[in-house]
């Protein structure tokens, strides 16, 4: 048996072998709705196939494999994800594919809300009738409020505004400059545009908000509070969308 949790930045795989042993492995993640099939397929294969080879097991021998992947937002993307695992040798009847947030709703029965926030953000809910609804998770351009990418962009904006003389956040700026090596607005602008679809690179600056606050920069706290409020709004929206207020 195998289970995969594939986020935008990190992928995790757990395997239970026939003799009862278990193994856990980590690799690079990917998001189907923004990275696309070709890129995600390459990441899936480079992560999973070496694990199978090292363990001397065949994909076709897997009884069940549950894939909870970021960016599985439509039947087409679900089918593309399934195709990737079929091409690796897993049997059609052994493959289960879910959005990485939706899968948590299957842990219990009855009304529930799940919020997942990593590189991106998404909320799912199951109402009294059993119907499943979602809010958010439509990529870093349309949504992903409060996420690692969103927080990372806020850090970059505040650092840019500090250079531009529009705000003062010297500690946050120094942390950003030390990590990025970027010193001018032109350099920052070029970096952001070059990394527009590389969410992991932008999200890597998110921890600087907390570090800056711990060192006495109130701008760091402002960013943390903004992301907190955005995540709360996401939960509130899916709560009402699922009619859980009735």
Question: What are these language model-derived features?
Answer:
Residues 66:
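Short aromatic/hydrophobic contact patches that present stacked aromatics
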Residues 1-62, 84-87, 108-113, 157-246:
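ATP-binding/phosphotransfer module of carbohydrate and carboxylate kinases, centering on a glycine-rich
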Residues 69:
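Short glycine-centered, acidic/aromatic-flanked micro-motifs in structured strand/loop junctions
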Residues 72-169:
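Phosphate-binding/catalytic loop of phosphoryl-transfer enzymes
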